[in-house]
């Protein structure tokens, strides 16, 4: 069985960096990682489609995501990414 995954999202002024960390025996190791451009006007639906496509391309089942951590230095984007996480992983 595949281990569960922590999804880390770091929203910066220029880029959004996303990484997955697999939980193995209590320790996380970096799995896939991606870098997207930060766009303040993107909707949660658009970002959700993008994130789902990245997961599909990497062969990651979104149901494996057990936890999501989001950090942001761009306050207007935080609620958008929170909605993405709630829609895809709750």
Regions found by a protein language model. Give the residues of each.
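Generic preference for flexible, low-structure residues
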Residues: 46-52, 81-86
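Short beta-strand-loop/turn "lid" adjacent to the catalytic site in phosphate-handling enzymes
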Residues: 58-90
């Amino acid at each position: 069985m595949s281990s569960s995954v922590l999804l880390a999202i770091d929203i910066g002024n220029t880029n959004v960096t996303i990484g997955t960390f697999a939980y193995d025996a209590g320790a996380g190791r970096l799995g896939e990682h991606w870098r997207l451009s930060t766009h303040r006007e993107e909707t949660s639906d658009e970002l959700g489609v993008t994130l789902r496509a990245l997961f599909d391309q990497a062969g990651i089942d979104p149901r494996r995501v057990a936890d999501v951590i989001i950090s942001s230095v761009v306050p207007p984007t935080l609620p958008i990414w929170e909605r993405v996480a709630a829609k895809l992983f709750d």
